[in-house]
Amino acid sequence: MEVKELMRQPYIIEKDISLIETAKIMSSKGLGCLLFVSNGKAKGIICDGDLLKNFGKHKRISSIMSKNIISIRPETTIEEALKLMKENKIKRLPVVDENKKLVGILSMADIAANIDKFDGEFFFG
């Protein structure tokens, strides 16, 4: 199975906002992360853990977001995506096209929600 079959549309922001604004958006939308995008390309990712580590600080997302984004292509297999998540200790992967334009996001939760689509061999060898 390929990433494009399970990926979702990401929630993006295109301007530098405060952590308070970020927390409000994530809370109201039930999101675990936001992607900071410029000209269609992901420039940073901020996740709930980043907010917790910086709780109460008057900062903007640009100062704490992860800028070294690990991304995948829509044609990447779910197995490869899981391996990348495990190796890098991350739960979400932005999905980009051949021009590095953001086209989706894949999370561990997306994979878990679709576990019935995989056979037992996939997870348990």
Give short role names for the model-derived ranges:
Residues 1-9, 23, 27, 45-86, ...:
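Tandem CBS (Bateman) regulatory domains
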Residues 13-15, 32-45, 72-73, 91-105:
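Cytosolic beta-strand hydrophobic patch enriched in CBS
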Residues 19:
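Active-site hotspot residues in diverse enzymes, especially metal/ion-binding acidic/histidine motifs
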